[in-house]
Amino acid sequence: NTGQCIPLNIIAQEFVDYVKSHDLDPEKTLLWMVSSQIACNIGMFPHHLRSLLNSYGKGMEKAQVYVGAMSFMDISLRLPINTYFAYMFGGLIRKIGCRIRPYEKKMGTTDRVIQEGVDILVDAFLGKRSKEEALADVISSFQRIEISSERKPKVAIFGDLYVRDNDVMNQDLIRFIESHNGEVIVTPYSAYAQMIARAYLKKWFFEGRYLEVLSSKALLATVTRMQKTYQKHFGKILENPAPQYDEDPERILSEYHVRIEHTGESMDNLLKIFYIK
């Protein structure tokens, strides 16, 4: 790796492994990578992946790297919305798990319900049943878990985007905190996107990237309206109504002498700290 927050060598290796395990012709395959000018030097990711595949050889140099929009709008108009809700559902299920597991009376119950819930929601995203119906069933299962009334110190996890919720990379940090009598606060990526959206929209406007601003604002408005249907179910266990992330980012950042023109996870984390404190 060359210092990126996302280990590109792992992405390239997983692509190679997938092509091999499914006996695909590399010349007829594409590795998707985001086109972006945000932090972490993401703009060079496609080029570096191309170099990694060329270096690997063995036919993989014939595979292509497809540079696509972060929203996936160039693939399908429905895909950005489904992607957002996949992150929302997954993130909030993880948050519920962290809320309940430290207090469960029968150890292992929460993890079992999480796994069963994920399986149910996968079917919903595959179109086999209604998402709202599936979510209602999952939340009911969580509500049936017997828990104690004690309260433990809460610990929020900050840090690198890739490592924060990756149990392998962070060495099972959540279980470590829970084993030392803590309750972990995690942030779903859907909430994280809402927290930082206003700052990036302003930044892109200043940079003259008006099309990105318009398309992103339209997508944000759509998912914000649609998620109210699902939030009422999550609200039976988590906060209801859902938190609002509509404070002026310039005011928040100015306390730390950071400007809208700055970018990166340090800026993002300042906004996150403000909203979850």
Model-found features: residue ranges?
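An N-terminal assembly and electron-transfer interface module characteristic of large anaerobic redox
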Residues: 1-277
